[in-house]
């Protein structure tokens, strides 16, 4: 299915371009060749390498003390190895600008777009989160939806989001549009991306976003 679904095709083309030989650049589903070549030993080794105490997160809520929880975890997870297989390091996304096309016979084009993002631990992360809500993360209230869909009818949906991965950060989004109008959609998105960079947001937009996000 991933070889015939336009969204999967553009997603894989995007990951390959942006992340190259890093694991983020390969398909989550593998390839026909790589999956066919898997053995039982490969599966066991992957399982043993992934489940280890150095990458385990546990949360607990309820009538239990720290000591009781520690004893329970030791009994349940004590046999796990202390450390697992080495994790891939950070990767600097390759974002040279421009447009790359993955040819596929379909009446509608799917577009993925991105720029460098921001780490969740960055002190400006929540400001960026609000900014993204105004630009493309706020559904019908967002600028992208207003300009690309409501005013011009170029798409049924367009959005952006902060993609804070463990090894890389992106600010990215997607839009689907008819082949004969997708170039216009891309131009409008670029213009709005630039406008929010140069002009910022209005006091009303900021207040509305903060009110929505805080309930």
Task: State what each model feature region is.
Residues 16, 85-141:
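His/Glu-based metal-binding/catalytic segments typifying zinc-dependent metallopeptidases
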Residues 1-84, 101, 127, 151-152, ...:
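Charge-rich, well-structured scaffold segments of protease-associated domains
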């Amino acid at each position: 299915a991933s070889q015939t679904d336009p969204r999967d095709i553009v997603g894989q083309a995007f990951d390959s371009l942006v992340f190259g030989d890093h694991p983020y650049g390969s398909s989550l589903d593998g390839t026909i060749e790589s999956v066919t070549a898997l053995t039982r030993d490969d599966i066991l080794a992957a399982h043993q390498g992934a489940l280890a105490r150095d990458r385990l997160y546990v949360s607990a809520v309820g009538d239990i003390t720290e000591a009781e929880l520690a004893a329970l975890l030791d009994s349940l997870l004590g046999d796990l190895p202390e450390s697992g297989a080495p994790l891939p390091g950070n990767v600097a996304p390759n974002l040279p600008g421009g447009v790359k096309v993955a040819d596929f016979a379909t009446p509608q084009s799917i577009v993925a777009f991105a720029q460098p993002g921001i780490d969740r631990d960055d002190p400006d992360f929540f400001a960026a989160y609000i900014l993204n809500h105004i630009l493309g993360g706020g559904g019908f209230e967002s600028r992208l939806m207003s300009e690309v869909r409501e005013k011009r009818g170029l798409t049924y949906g367009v959005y952006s989001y902060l993609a804070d991965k463990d090894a890389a950060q992106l600010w990215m989004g997607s839009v689907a549009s008819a082949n004969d109008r997708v170039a216009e959609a891309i131009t409008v998105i670029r213009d709005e991306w630039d406008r929010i960079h140069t002009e910022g947001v209005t006091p009303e937009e900021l207040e509305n976003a903060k009110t929505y996000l805080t309930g």
